[in-house]
């Protein structure tokens, strides 16, 4: 994906599920108008989830996911079914492809139960309608044929209706601004920064400021103080990369609100309150306690990486405890969090809302406090209250 494309996390994720040879891959190819997936009469041709980011009318930017057969067998088959279940954790919408010549099976019914359990909007597409008539169709059902394309346009329209309202009103920072406001963005550029570009949360925040008809000034942490002195207008707020919190707090006058990209991202993803409540667990940590530090992506680690170097160092300095720190990255996230006393997650800019919510709920179900990098660093640096003063309800939660 190029830097000009919509980020994967901001695309609607549409998963196609079903038994082997129900025609999932054929339906996916018909919907996308591309040979996205290999098609064969051999059962189990799709052995791993196939993901494709694309623009698909009338939905717009989407990620299409073709999954292995849910009735796969054997040791490898069980692993494929497990991968299919993992896809459910990020699916904004599900399409169950059923072989119309065979009808609904127990495996199909199990998938429907999983959709309902996870509150995933779904449709049931009876494929091969050119070979057999579908049963009497319910509200969520329709007949399609990947061969003749019967029902394919209707399927696309109905998927669009299911997903149309998702994320429409979400803003990173624009809802906190009034047109004409001035916002200062602090973006450190160190050995861990990507070459030639800003990281995704910084890009997205900058764009949201502009979309709100406001002015963004982008500076490094070592030029913040002189920049503020030159301004004739007081900024509405200063937004910083969390790792520079301590210096930016010192250099930003107390009458200017201060927060971080990570904190705004937690709010955008819907778990900021959980993060604020969860960070208090740091003060209860004891020697030997297990802490999971989780990343949503698999970027190359540098010598001063925030997740594997800086946060562990600051945790040790703050708590004085001998903690057992463990790390996960990308899609590798533990299903059982009960052994941990705390989960510290990144901002989640590379994860869509569904997957971020799944991770938060997994921690909640295990009774494990869940927080994120920005809130953690603000707490460790003693500026948590200041970092959330833009959000009065959360500010009131803190002593």
Regions found by a protein language model. Name each.
Residues 67, 98-102, 120-136, 142-150, ...:
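G-domain G4 guanine-recognition motif of GTPases
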Residues 52-60, 75-143, 171-175, 198-214, ...:
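Conserved C-terminal guanine-recognition region of P-loop GTPase G domains, centered on the G4
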Residues 117-175, 179-184, 213-222, 259-260, ...:
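Canonical P-loop GTPase G-domain recognition
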Residues 41, 70-76, 99-103, 162-164, ...:
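Short, flexible loop segments at the rims of nucleotide/cofactor-binding pockets, characterized by
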Residues 1-2, 19-25, 195-399:
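C-terminal effector/interaction modules appended to NTPase cores
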Residues 176-204:
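Long, well-ordered amphipathic alpha-helical subdomains in the mid-to-C-terminal portions
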Residues 14, 183, 289-291:
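Conserved hydrophobic helix-helix packing surfaces used for dimerization/oligomerization
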Residues 1-78, 82, 86-89:
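Conserved G1/Walker A P-loop phosphate-binding module
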